[in-house]
Amino acid sequence: MAGHSKWANTRHRKAAQDAKRGKIFTKIIRELVTAAKLGGGDPDANPRLRAAVDKALSNNMTRDTLNRAIARGVGGDDDANMETIIYEGYGPGGTAIMIECLSDNRNRTVAEVRHAFSKCGGNLGTDGSVAYLFSKKGVISFEKGDEDTIMEAALEAGAEDVVTYDDGAIDVYTAWEEMGKVRDALEAAGLKADSAEVSMIPSTKADMDAETAPKLMRLIDMLEDCDDVQEVYHNGEISDEVAATL
């Protein structure tokens, strides 16, 4: 399957922005603590923790920092009292948006999320309003690689799909619980991924034009600026021509 790696570009853009803000490690540590608290400190027996570990390593977090966060979760650190909250809504141009949060104060979090939507021409929806448009998947990404080699190793390891893009990037899609196992198998075959993360993949896309794309980007930026927001997923499709103007 060929195409342009817009989803990969979105992930890379987000990672760069989060790193610039100095927030990405804070958010990853919060997820590590919570995952360890809820499912135990063994990544092999805790898919959510394994996904958080993979994300931490993809963002160059040291093993020492990572292990301390897991220990905090297992030991009942205060951060482990966070709960996962999912908000759904519609953004500019009819984009479907899902926001994954970790919070110890629902009222604070929903107020911040609602404010971002109202400032950017969107609407916070009810539970289930857009969730049906997304599927939770593991995404293992290679910026470059041999398509046949990666595809053979990935499918043999249990991957669901392998997508090659026009720019040479390759994404391997897995059941989210199997992402760690598939990544291990790829590494055992000498194929080191550039990133691995659990994501919500949309089944449909909403085309953004020169008017709606900047509004969508502003909404995403505002949501990602919220301390309680861990991830923002959307189905906005931005062409190369429009992206060049942003």
UniProtKB/Swiss-Prot annotation:
GO terms for biological process: regulation of DNA-templated transcription; response to ionizing radiation. Its main location: cytoplasm. Keywords: Cytoplasm, DNA-binding, Transcription, Transcription regulation. InterPro entries: Integrase-like_N, TACO1_YebC-like_2nd/3rd_dom, TACO1_YebC_N, Transcrip_reg_TACO1-like, Transcrip_reg_TACO1-like_dom3, YebC-like. It is found in: Cytoplasm. Belongs to the TACO1 family. This is Probable transcriptional regulatory protein YebC.
